[in-house]
Amino acid sequence: MNKQWLHFFSVLLLCYVIEETCSLKVEDLPLPKTYLKAVELAKKDAGKDTKLLEKGLLILKNNRRDCMTNCKLVDTCHRLSPECCPEMTPTCLKLDIVQAFLKAQGKL
C-alpha cells in the first residue's frame, strides 16, 4: 500500500514538473521597449538609493505581471505589458497566468 502512494505522488510530482517547464511565463518573454523606458525612469528617479531602486523595480515587475490579466490595474498597463493590453495577442493567450485567469472566468 505504501509503495502505491509513493508511485502516485511520484507521478503527480513528475506531471507538475513537466507542466511548469512547458508553460510560458511572463519572465520568458522579451522585455518591451516601453517597459525598459519605465525601468530607466525608475533608475533615474531613485538616484543612488539602491533600496528605493529595488522597490521601484519590484513594483514595475509585479505590475507588469498583474497587468497581463487586468489591464485596468494601473494607467500604464499598456506600457508595462503591451502583449496583453489593450488587446490580448496570441502570445499573451499562451501565458500560464492568463490561461489560469481565463479558466477561472470560464472563458477557456
UniProtKB/Swiss-Prot annotation:
MF GO annotations: toxin activity
Highest taxon above the source species: Eukaryota
Post-translational modification summary for this protein: Contains 3 disulfide bonds.
Gene Ontology CC: one annotated term: extracellular region
Expression by tissue: Expressed by the venom gland.
Keyword terms of this UniProt record: Disulfide bond, Secreted, Signal, Toxin
Stretch forming the signal peptide: 1-24
Predominant cellular place of this UniProt entry's protein: secreted
Compartments where found: Secreted
Family named by the database record: Belongs to the scoloptoxin-10 family.
Protein name: U-scoloptoxin(10)-Sm1a
Originating organism: Scolopendra morsitans
